[in-house]
From Swiss-Prot:
Broad class of the protein's primary localization: membrane
CHCR repeats mapped onto the chain: 602-756
Zn finger intervals (RING-type): 837-884
Family: Belongs to the VPS18 family.
Ranges occupied by TPR repeats: 314-345, 373-406, 408-436, 546-579
Keywords: Membrane, Metal-binding, Repeat, TPR repeat, Vacuole, Zinc, Zinc-finger
Function: Required for vacuolar biogenesis.
Protein name: Vacuolar membrane protein pep3
MF terms in GO: protein-macromolecule adaptor activity; ubiquitin protein ligase activity; zinc ion binding
Listed GO biological process terms: endosome organization; Golgi to endosome transport; intracellular protein transport; late endosome to vacuole transport; organelle fusion; vacuole organization; vesicle docking involved in exocytosis; vesicle tethering
Pfam family, one: Pep3_Vps18
Protein's cellular compartments: Vacuole membrane
Length: 900
């Protein structure tokens, strides 16, 4: 597949069509190029009951005057609806229909006769005879409907005068519509007007007569209440052209109003000797072109009165029964067609619809339409052949023709070494990019090539991804090469000011290309180009536009520019990139790196563990300055991370630094509490590995491995710590005793300070001297224990004496209780029969009562009631009535329940 094939998007049908069209290029060797189908004469399928006398058409409204004194009105948009109108008898009393005129909308119809009678038909097809125009056979009419009920007509009379007729179009009084008539201009004897042309730009009037062409221009702008046509004739008159006495005008026509700058706005006048073209758009210095008869002898035969019309670029005329069309641009014949006539049929003339740009040929018995198919297409190729490229482009209304014109124009500019303009035009064509680029490369026009590729790139559609990508990378290479070339010039001090301006221009182009076409950039190819050309600034610019922070960071780390790398990290990079360069950044910029990490709360901390451990191994800083510890403390403390691997890592780093100071690890273990997040088995191994025995003991205690903890503490010769551990299991006396025995054995095995050892072991509260003596080594003399034994015996004696005293006190209390009980059995009180209750004064024996030693007696119910009244709810609710102290005391003398 060639490079040229890459420029056409196979998925774009539009581009394919343009490419196929572009294959047909204009060449002078092919005279039939683009001519086929431009003009065709087609007969209209209309049946006429009688012959046609004259015809007019405007705005697709076609009106024919028939020999039957009727008007046939055909709306070409609805040709099936034909309207017949009878002409007023007054109009045709003395003459025949001479001409028909239509206003630009086609709604008003003006009919004039050979006898000078005239009538006007309104949109409702009501005819009114214009009596004020009696005797004037009209040659031309200009219309002005001011939007109200006033219709102004500028009339050219065959009698040699210009008239302004004002009509009132009041539907209530259509019988009297003529308001006023004024004579604006009178022509000399033997001079009669043939046509009127209104210039819409300056309200001037161009009048064509049989002797000359005049232009009437108003001096001032028209007043609010002033008539429309009068000001032009009150101003200046300029004679544009006059004919000799031997030459008279026969007919005239003007072209449609131009749609573009290439179309001429032309008035054509046929005389007895020649055809004259007049440029209407330039009234001051008109461009008058003569078309001599010797170019086409056929024109010398005037068969009908109106045998000539103008299209946008062509002249159509009749010669006997043949229609000829000549291109006005190059004067060559473009079309001819013989009109088939019946034995008694005659051609009457040609007619033009200036509103819809349609053209008609009519005979006595038939109507033909001159169909114009894309006339500007042929005109464009003719302008191209003449080298008038600007007009050719104006007229190029198809992709095929425009491509042909652009290619021709560009090749012309290449021949004249106007390379930049040629590049701009080439970019608009479908010519292969490879072919055009080779032309500029062969001419060593690299700047022009860059311009061409720029223009071409901007012309591509969004769907042409591959082509755009190729051009973007090509442009990148050209710009990088240009920058290197400018650097070399600057190094040699050649034109420094010019070099600076060029560099700024290329840099602007480079930035624009990256910003506008970043989606089409091949990232790897662009990086390779920038690296190959050694353009660091542009390389980073590409990566920045592509938002490839990973590449930028990799670039700076490779070059050990850690400040720039940190700036990139702060702007945000992918997790993968951050992890990839974490070790390097931690090693060289630890605190700054951790500060940035702390602002990125969504990091995969687990993936950073290798970098943190590597940094910890390489760095030789105290715990307070260790960035790994700082970050892990932030993650576990602030972010609340509970991942065991993170806590294990922090534990490991603490352990590494605990050989000199174990307090940080101890604090961490204490902070973790009884349910730590680190692995305690791993923690013990790490503590043993780094000789952190106190920390290991703490972990063993947390695991309730008291025996191992005591043994480890004793291995560290820390009896105080071992004693602390032994006192922890308060409820398990057996275990506690075993632990203390282990401590005792260890301390006795050291054979130093037996007295101090025994004094220390006495604090255990679980080991007695006899037990300690059994634990003593055999080689220890009892003399060393005499003081301790004596102290122990004294302690036992004091204890025995204390127990004897307590027993004596208990015996005395028991004897006293027994004596009181015996006395209570022999005690009684005598009650009289009339004894009453001390509360209610009722007889005491009437119901159950209570008698107290003080000889007061109460009914049981009265006593309870009195108690309820005196006791508060708070006192009643103070204790349980079954097990409260007061109740329990009362139950001392009660027998045991049989239900128990």
């Amino acid at each position: 597949m060639s490079l040229a094939e890459d420029w056409i998007d196979p998925n774009s049908s539009e581009d394919s069509d343009i490419q196929e069209d572009a294959e047909l290029e204009y060449t002078a060797d092919n005279p039939e190029k683009e001519q086929r189908g431009v003009f065709s004469l087609e007969k209209v399928q209309l049946q006429f009951p009688v012959s046609i006398r004259c015809l007019a058409v405007e705005n697709n409204i076609l009106v024919m005057a028939l020999t039957s004194d009727k008007l046939m009105i055909v709306d070409l948009e609805r040709p099936e609806d034909i309207i017949d109108i009878e002409l007023p008898k007054k109009v045709l009393a003395l003459g025949l229909t001479y001409k028909i005129f239509l206003d630009p909308s086609g709604h008003y119809i003006f009919v004039t006769t050979t006898a000078g009678d005239n009538c006007l038909f309104t949109p409702s097809h009501q005819g009114r005879v214009l009596t004020k125009l009696k005797g004037h056979t009209v040659e031309a009419v200009q219309w002005n409907l001011n939007g109200g009920n006033i219709l102004e007509l500028l009339i050219a009379s065959k009698s040699g005068v210009l008239l302004e007729l004002v009509l009132t179009l009041d539907s209530a009084n259509l019988k009297r519509i003529e308001k006023s008539i004024n004579t604006l201009y009178s022509f000399p004897f033997m001079e009669s007007p043939m046509g009127i042309l209104k210039n819409i730009q300056d309200d001037s009037m161009t009048i064509v007569t049989n002797k000359r062409i005049l232009r009437f221009e108003p001096k001032t702008s028209r007043g609010k209440d002033q008539l429309y046509f009068s000001p032009a004739f009150q101003g200046s008159m300029k004679e544009i052209l006059s004919f000799s006495e031997e030459e008279t005008a026969q007919c005239f026509s003007y072209s449609p109003f131009p749609k573009n700058l290439a179309e001429p706005y032309t008035l054509a006048l046929k005389t007895s000797k020649r055809i004259i073209y007049l440029d209407i758009m330039n009234p001051v210095n008109p461009d008058i072109q003569d078309y001599e008869f010797n170019e086409s002898p056929k024109l010398s035969v005037p068969t009908v009165e109106m045998n000539m019309i103008l299209t946008s670029f062509h002249l159509a005329f009749l010669d006997l029964d043949t229609l000829y069309i000549v291109n006005r641009v190059n004067g060559k014949e473009s079309y001819q067609q013989r009109v088939n006539l019946s034995p008694h049929e005659e051609i009457l003339g040609l007619c033009c619809d200036h509103e819809k740009n349609t053209y008609w040929l009519y005979t006595t018995d038939s109507l033909h339409e001159l169909v114009v198919n894309n006339e500007t297409r042929e005109a464009s190729l003719v302008f191209l052949e003449k080298g008038d490229f600007e007009k050719a482009l104006e007229c190029a209304n198809t992709a095929k023709v425009r491509n042909t014109v652009l290619v021709g124009y560009a090749e012309f500019l290449m021949e004249h070494e106007e390379y930049e303009r040629a590049a701009t035009l080439y970019a608009e064509t479908l010519k292969s990019v490879e072919e055009v680029a080779l032309k500029f490369i062969e001419l060593n026009q690299k700047d022009v090539l860059r311009l061409y590729l720029w223009k071409k790139l901007r012309s591509y559609k969004s769907t042409m991804k591959i082509q755009k990508s190729l051009l973007v990378n090509w442009l990148l290479e050209l710009m990088l090469a240009k920058l290197n070339s400018l650097d070399e010039k600057e190094r040699l001090e050649l034109f420094p000011e010019n070099v600076m301006q060029q560099r700024q221009q290329v840099q602007r182009e480079f930035s624009t290309l990256l910003n506008q076409y970043k989606d089409e950039i091949n990232r790897e190819a662009a990086y390779n180009l920038a690296n190959n050309y050694g353009k660091e600034e542009q390389l980073l610019q590409i990566a920045t536009v592509m938002k490839d922070q990973s590449y930028i960071m990799h670039y700076w780390v490779q070059r050990e520019n850690y400040e720039k790398a940190l700036e990139t990290l702060n702007e945000g990079v992918s997790q993968e990139t951050l992890i990839q360069h974490a070790t390097a950044l931690l090693t060289h910029r630890p605190n700054e790196t951790v500060s940035i990490w702390e602002r990125q709360t969504d990091l995969d901390v687990h993936a950073l563990i290798p970098s943190l451990l590597s940094y910890n191994q390489r760095s030789h800083v105290p715990v307070e300055e260790n960035a790994a510890i700082r970050y892990l403390r932030y993650v576990t403390g602030v972010l609340g991370c509970v991942d065991p691997s993170i806590h294990n890592t922090l534990f490991c780093i603490y352990a590494c630094h605990s050989s000199s100071n174990e307090s940080y690890l101890m604090n961490y273990i204490e902070q973790q509490g009884n349910h730590p997040l680190y692995d305690m088995d791993l923690g013990i191994r790490l503590c043993l590995q780094f000789n952190c025995r106190r920390s290991a003991v703490k972990i063993l205690v947390l695991m309730k491995l008291y025996s191992q903890g005591v043994e480890l503490a004793l291995e560290a010769d820390d009896c105080e710590l071992a004693a602390t551990i032994a006192n922890i299991p308060e409820e398990d006396v057996v275990l506690k005793k075993t632990l203390w025995q282990t401590i005792a054995k260890y301390m006795f095995s050291k054979k130093s300070g037996i007295k101090e050892t025994l004094r220390f072991l006495e604090n255990s509260e679980v080991l007695q001297l006899p037990e300690l003596i059994r634990l003593l080594p055999e080689d220890i003399k009892l003399d060393d224990l005499s003081d301790n034994v004596c102290d122990e015996l004294d302690h036992c004696m004091k204890r025995i004496e204390q127990l004897d005293f307590e027993i004596g006190q208990a015996s005395e209390v028991a004897h006293e209780i027994q004596t009181n009980a015996e006395n209570m059995r022999n005690r009684y009180i005598v009650l009289e029969p009339n004894e009453s209750c001390w509360h209610c004064n009722q007889p005491l024996f009437s119901e159950p009562f209570v008698l107290f030693p003080c000889q007061h007696a109460f009914h049981r119910s009265c006593m309870l009631e009195k108690t309820y009244k005196l006791a508060s709810e708070k006192n009643i609710l103070k204790e349980c009535q079954l097990c409260g102290p007061s109740y329990a005391v009362r139950l001392i003398n009660e027998p045991f329940s049989t239900d128990f």
